[in-house]
């Protein structure tokens, strides 16, 4: 067993994405038996102490079937209507199946904008992590009934990768109607060897995936590779596997050589901090006293309001701010939980005083250590 497969055995936070072709039996209708099987396997993962978020496709495809569409319509409003109709069937099927295993579920509808806007990102992050901590299975889909570009792209693979980053997942599982990633299109070349394990950033993979897409789900292997790279930047491994294979999730959890594993190059926390440090512009900054700088640098703790001496700029909740010490030297960057006005009010005060001063408490930390990228 490879070291990457061994790490899957210890994965605690999972994001599982099920594609349209699987859920709707290639457009015939909702695969109730398949859903029962996946829900049973997810329930088993929960029994083992794992936390699992489920990203589902299939709403638009199921809507096509219910509305009698034989071809994908060009009208965005027809697509939105199909999504609204199909979503009902998908959610009801999951709820019914999970109920058989005494599992609670929650519906979370997102658009990519929700994850790009830092304030909404923090709200989504907090909600999803709370659900996972309570042992609830979040059933996540794009809000296709109001979205536009998301429907046209059909990019739930990318949504799943963003969710994996959002909840600091250890593994992202993309269940599809293929055994994994092959060196060539298996529908054209049936004997094409399957890739067992590669780095997500292996450039040879680009030539292998080509540009093909399925008829029902718009995201083929190209988007799955792109999604794996997004997840890898957050330190999350990706497994592409055949959702129709019996007990496929259990096999992955046990480290069996199934599907294709695309590995991340860094650990999750390091990847998150690299992303914060390198890719997001600073909206402002805060200055820490010497004691706070020492605690953050030496012990890796969160930034608390009590250690802040000055506030710079006009940043909002969820923005990236530059953190400096009393000498002006940069300590790091981080995603801040309070805006500049609120931070200025609570600076120098302990966490217990936040509610009294603001009238509410979002987070006890000004910047959580998970969202803090140190410069030294």
Model-identified regions with their sequence ranges:
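C-terminal catalytic "cap/lid" subdomain
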Residues: 1-376
């Amino acid at each position: 067993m490879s070291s990457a497969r061994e790490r899957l055995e210890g994965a605690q936070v999972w994001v599982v994405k099920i594609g349209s072709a699987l859920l709707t039996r290639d457009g015939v209708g909702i695969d109730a038996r398949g859903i029962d099987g996946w829900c049973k396997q997810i329930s088993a993962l929960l029994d083992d102490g794992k936390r699992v978020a489920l990203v589902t496709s299939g709403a638009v495809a199921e809507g096509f079937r219910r509305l009698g569409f034989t071809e994908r319509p060009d009208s965005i409003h027809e697509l939105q209507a199909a999504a609204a109709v199909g979503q009902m069937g998908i959610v009801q099927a999951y709820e019914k199946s999970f109920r058989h295993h005494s599992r609670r579920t929650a519906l979370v509808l997102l658009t990519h904008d929700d994850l790009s806007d830092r304030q909404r990102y923090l709200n989504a992050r907090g909600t999803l992590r709370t659900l996972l901590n309570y042992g609830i299975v979040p059933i996540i889909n794009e809000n296709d009934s109001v979205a536009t570009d998301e429907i046209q792209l059909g990019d739930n693979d990318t949504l799943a990768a963003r969710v994996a980053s959002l909840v600091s997942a250890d593994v992202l599982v993309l269940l599809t109607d293929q055994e994994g990633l092959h060196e060539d299109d298996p529908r054209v070349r049936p004997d094409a060897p399957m890739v067992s394990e590669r780095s997500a950033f292996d450039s040879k993979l680009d030539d292998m995936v080509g540009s093909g897409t399925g008829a029902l789900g718009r995201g083929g292997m190209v988007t799955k590779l792109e999604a794996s790279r997004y997840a890898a930047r957050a330190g999350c491994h990706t497994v592409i596997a055949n959702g129709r294979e019996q007990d496929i999730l259990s096999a992955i959890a046990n480290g069996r050589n199934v599907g294709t594993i695309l590995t991340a190059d860094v650990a999750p926390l390091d990847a998150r901090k690299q992303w914060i440090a390198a890719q997001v512009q600073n909206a402002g900054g805060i200055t820490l006293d010497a004691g706070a700088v020492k605690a953050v640098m030496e012990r890796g703790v969160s930034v608390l309001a009590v250690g802040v001496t000055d506030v710079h700029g006009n940043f909002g909740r969820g923005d990236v701010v530059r953190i400096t010490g009393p000498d002006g030297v940069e300590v790091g960057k981080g995603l801040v939980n309070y805006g500049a006005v609120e931070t200025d009010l609570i600076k120098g005060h302990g966490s217990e005083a936040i509610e009294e001063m603001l009238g509410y408490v979002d987070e006890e930390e000004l910047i959580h250590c998970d969202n803090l990228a140190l410069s030294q």
